Amino acid sequence: REQAKGKSQIKMMDYGTIFAGKTALEILRQMVGGYVRMNQQEQMLMFYKVIYSERCIQPMAAKIMAEETERMILATKQLFYAMEIHKILHFQDADMSAVSFAMTVHGLMDYGLDKQTGKYEAADRKKDLMDEYLKWFCEENAVERNCEDTKQRV
């Protein structure tokens, strides 16, 4: 994970710099895209395939998956707190929004991988579905509850 994180150039977040001149949608695309790229590296894909297949019978595999999910949720909470402070998005409950968002992104990634592995549908559809979700999420959590707000730049 740490090697994949390094290769994806994921580092400490300076939210002011990340947010500068970007819409909420652009920010979420950037953040989710980094996470997707990290997890699509060959070593990470192989690791996850093994962990996924073992987690229902091996406590250590389940623990690894739970810890990764907790890291993803924590990172999402931090992002959402920063987006709220910078008035980019507004959340009724930032913590639960982060859980919902992180789990949905994770589920969409899994869904896309399953379709790709099963040669059921092109991986491009996964990107379309993820982007549709990100657009919907921005509209639902716009500061003024106005779709146009997601187009405003910080």
Give the label of every model feature segment.
Residues R1-K5, N39, T104, M109-Y111:
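Feature detects amphipathic, helix-rich regulatory segments
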Residues K22, E26, M38, E42-M46, ...:
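Amphipathic alpha-helical packing segments from all-alpha helical-bundle domains
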Residues E26, Q30-G34, Q78-I85, M103-V154:
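C-terminal peripheral helix-coil segments that are non-catalytic and often amphipathic
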Residues M12-F19, K49-E54, K115-K119:
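Short linear capping/connector segments at secondary-structure termini
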Residues I18, V32-Q40, Y48-C56, E132-F137:
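Helix-loop "lid/cap" segments that line or gate small-molecule binding pockets
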Residues R1-M31:
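Amphipathic alpha-helical linker/stalk segments
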